């Protein structure tokens, strides 16, 4: 009766194994595994935000607020520089009261007095927080832009303290990628004071609240108000359209409060020119003919592709600061193909060598080891396909390493079974004791590998993450196939009286 129950349980386990194997094979076929940059080809960028621009912009915003707040004091001028905000004093006795007003606006400042000037600077802690926010926002915006490009399984991750790594598998248009990722898309609408082809002429009219910007083609210079009327943050949406001449353009719509503000501004400045500034260049400067409220158009001799890309960038928002491209790497599809072929060859060779050694050493038990290793790899690939994980060249190395770990576990179990047989136990008892007495060692090995994989994934990047992913999934698959299904196969061979070990 007990023997019948044991055989029934054995066949139930085998049925479960067959179902799991078929489901795994279906997952691999139904959900093709995503290939990484090193296998599929594509581009990789290493970026770093230019913090100086963002910090200078913060100083300009602070100076703009202070001009209004300090109007009741004897202050000659308030203007921003790269190092801080300069306040020129007419009466030094008011300096303490001025400091209190400034700290009410932003408490994260320090003061330096230089003669009749008060220099306002951000604290180091505040600057570090600004940098942290800039990196975080940049990563979010880059991800959003890349998602809208339709790139499969892109990688946008932080490297070190302030750098950003971007992998675009299968995307080989480097210039377009750099333009979309690196464009700050800093859209500003500013009132034009004067225009000239001679910059020096405009410099005579410069004041702290004005600036000179070049046209998109570099032929003209525009003297404009520093303070923008509208910025990219005020946009509700942006989409491709055509101008009066039928050329590609970008239409935009404004949010509620911004639309109301823009309507008042245009109504008060009819007949004047409004500069549309994109990334510090004037793309167009139309004359305000009438009141404009919630929508506008950006023209500038764009191609259809340029207009689409600009609309995409404006919809995702402007970067908090320009990005510096520290490194770029292009992996051609041919190199990726070679890497796949080499990886497949290495894997096949490893499987053949393992199969030969195991069968030579453990006879029919070696066959069960080979089957469990095959299932290990199948379960691993099915897990990657189902989870949408990306396979990289280091990931293939992780798969091969997992095969070695699986062999190690099988050898440990088989040697223990042989030892139990030498002690005079029956084959069934030897199998039972062999697995039971090696379980703790096999468990410790797999848990240690899993912990190491998690640490590598958490703190690694790029290739290291690919290796860690396959190692972690492979470790779980290895434990299931070696500890559970290897025993099922040994019991099956024993019940059929063909087990040799």
Swiss-Prot record:
Pfam (any one): SecD_1st
Keyword Transport included in the entry's annotation: yes
Membrane topology: Multi-pass membrane protein
Stored SUPFAM superfamilies: Multidrug efflux transporter AcrB transmembrane domain (SSF82866)
Regions crossing the membrane: 9-29, 339-359, 371-391, 394-414, 447-467, 470-490
Main location: membrane
InterPro entries: SecD, SecD/SecF_arch_bac, SecD/SecF_CS, SecD_1st, SecD_SecF_C, SecD_SecF_C_bact, SecDF_P1_head
GO (cellular component) term, any one: plasma membrane
Disulfide-bond pairs as recorded: none
Compartments reported by the entry: Cell inner membrane
A GO MF label: protein-transporting ATPase activity
Endpoints of the signal sequence: none
Keyword Membrane: yes
Biological process annotations from GO: intracellular protein transmembrane transport; protein targeting; protein transport; protein transport by the Sec complex
Keywords per UniProt: Cell inner membrane, Cell membrane, Membrane, Protein transport, Translocation, Transmembrane, Transmembrane helix, Transport
Role played: Part of the Sec protein translocase complex. Interacts with the SecYEG preprotein conducting channel. SecDF uses the proton motive force (PMF) to complete protein translocation after the ATP-dependent function of SecA.
Similarity remark: Belongs to the SecD/SecF family. SecD subfamily.
Assembly description: Forms a complex with SecF. Part of the essential Sec protein translocation apparatus which comprises SecA, SecYEG and auxiliary proteins SecDF. Other proteins may also be involved.
HAMAP family: SecD_B
Protein name, as recorded: Protein translocase subunit SecD
Protein species of origin: Aquifex aeolicus (strain VF5)
Taxonomy of the source species: Bacteria, Pseudomonadati, Aquificota, Aquificia, Aquificales
